[in-house]
Amino acid sequence: MPAIRKATRGDACRLAEIEIFNYRLNFYPYFRTDAYFFSELNVSALMQAYRDMPERIEHTFVYDDGVVKGFVRINGAEIEKLFVEPAFQGQGIGGALLDHAIRHAGADWLLVLEKNEGAIRLYERHGFRLTEQRHRVDDTEEYLVRMER
């Protein structure tokens, strides 16, 4: 039976895999920095960061049905990260994690890449609305937009 539970250090490898795969899938097409996405950004280093920095896991919840398929990280009222393993997207996992963040942690805002239309649609289905706030991503032409409930 699927469960949403608090992440543990033992989840570090899956958290890192899911995050890396999503970064490459969702952000590489816009930022196209090969050295970062395919060298600096790697599962081994991120897994170690999860293990070495308990604050990365402290407010992270995983969707687990025998295999960790996605996770959400909350920072105060912000949904800081929400990722589902690409192979399992479209099965309601992201929505379940989002509902958990809203109901159990009081999350009510997030930042999302303006061009990530799929994520924006998911958030809108769960009561989030785009605001006028936009933040340029470093020295790029890309923007993060704020969504609130």
Residue ranges and their predicted role:
Residues L111-L113, R129-R146:
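Conserved catalytic-core motifs of GNAT/GCN5-like acyltransferases
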Residues R103-K115:
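Conserved GNAT acetyl-CoA-binding A-motif
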Residues E78-Q89, V112-L113:
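A short, internal acetyl-CoA/4′-phosphopantetheine-binding micro-motif in the GNAT/acyltransferase core
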Residues I57-G70:
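Conserved beta-hairpin
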Residues I20-A49:
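Conserved GNAT-fold acetyl-CoA-binding loop/helix
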Residues G90-R103, R121, R125:
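Conserved acetyl-CoA-binding loop-helix of GNAT-fold acetyltransferases
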Residues A3-E17:
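A short beta-loop-alpha structural element at the N-terminal edge
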